[in-house]
Amino acid sequence: MARKTLARGGLLALLTASVAACAAADTAPPQTAATAKGCLASGDGYLRARVRGALDLDVNWRNDEMECTGGSRPDGSGLRVSIAGPAQSDGRRLRFVFGIEGTAEGAAVGQRPTNLTVIFEGERRLFATQGDDKCTVDTLTQQRTGPLGGPKRSWRIEAHGFCVGPAATLTGDARLLVTRFDFAGRIDLTDEAPGK
């Protein structure tokens, strides 16, 4: 009798978990083309950058090999755009994070101070300008993408800029100078719920 009760209890738990998993799968939001593969659903994302110093790199990534995220800077003083390149088989990946000062959602701007961080994921190496006085976004444009209604808004963000000072490791023992950068990436902004 105890075995039957245990078997029924186990079967009931399995059925409950299966129903819950199916319900969760039905309510999960569908992946957009941009998040399923590549940076932008339109297929025209890119990052070009000339990097000199501790490493010499000429980056030329196209939409399908990139991962793009972004939104407001944590302090609300502008926008943050993160663009990662193709992941290597050993998990290593190069990521650029641009913190663009004084830029509002949807605005086309020029001559904006920019903080730049270059991250070598999987290698524990990070280079940062540690301020927005070494890099400048010459021009920046934004174009609304995706659904127009609802609390979430997505923007295609295109920028062209340069750095006059290097990004350094936190210990200061190595430096990278990104003499030129051009990118088209994405930011996603969400309205906060009332009362927050």
Please report, for each region that a protein language model flagged, where it lies by residue.
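Low-complexity, acidic/polar, glycine-enriched regions of mature
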Residues: S154, E192-P194
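C-terminal motif of bacterial Sec signal peptides marking the signal peptidase cleavage site
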Residues: A20-A21
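Exposed boundary/loop context
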Residues: A2-R3, G38, Y46, N115, ...
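An ectodomain-focused feature that recognizes extracytoplasmic/extracellular
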Residues: A25-D133
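Acidic, glycine-rich flexible loop segments
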Residues: Q111-I187
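Bacterial N-terminal signal peptides that target proteins for export
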Residues: M1-L11
